[in-house]
Amino acid sequence: MRFAILSPIYPYRGGIAQFSGMLYTELVKEGHEVKAFNFKRLYPDILFPGKTQYVEAGDRAIEIESVRVLDSVNPVSYFSTVNAIRSYAPDVLIISYWMSFFVPGYAHVANRMKKHCKVITLIHNAIPHEPRFFDKPLASLLFKQCHGFIVMSDNVRYDLRKLYPGAKYIQNPHPLYNHFGSKINKNEACRNPSVQKESSILWTDTGL
């Protein structure tokens, strides 16, 4: 089967990009043909509070080749993205969704592609933890363009069904990230100069 993935992916950093790299890799391992369609601009600099949006030297990243075509704030690129994906002629288009900021581009692509292939949205977060007035209607706009959904938690499933009661979805647990290297024991870790033996690590559930 031929898959297209529309998502931030390498050289972007962050959980969504890494997840999409894992998804790409696993689909290829299963014998599928896969092509990644990436953002050429994810966030405008004025809206990005961090140091960089990109992988830096020393970061562990899954390096995936991609077509960098979608600009989140340039509507002209929405048409270019549709053309690029249509020329690839996928059987399935998977869209990574986690924030309503990207709905204008995503919804345009989904609407234009749904007559040509199955459009599946992989939802990392349907509604933000602190929603703004436009988050729900924008998410609904995108979801109504899709044939089906993948969710990875009960909370996201609940939000999806609330926003789009007729949604067809499957639910699978969020996989563990596997690109950080092999597990090592405590004593070996403590021999690392950057790790203090007396230090303690507090694990918290942030909902991310």
Feature roles, as predicted:
Residues 75-81, 93-116:
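An aromatic- and histidine-rich active-site surface loop
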Residues 111-112, 132-149:
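Membrane-proximal helix-turn-helix segments that form the acceptor-binding/catalytic region
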Residues 192-208:
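Conserved donor-binding/catalytic core segment of Leloir-type glycosyltransferases
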Residues 42, 156, 172-182, 204-208:
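Short beta-strand->alpha-helix junction loop in the catalytic core
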Residues 132, 158-163, 175-193:
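Acidic anion/phosphate-binding donor-loop and adjacent secondary structure
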Residues 7-21, 44, 98-103:
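A short, glycine/small-residue-rich beta-strand->loop->alpha-helix junction that serves as a flexible
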Residues 11-13, 25-87, 156, 161:
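N-terminal strand-loop element at the rim of the active site
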Residues 98-102, 117-133, 147-148:
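A short, histidine- and acid-enriched strand-loop-helix "catalytic/donor-clamping" loop
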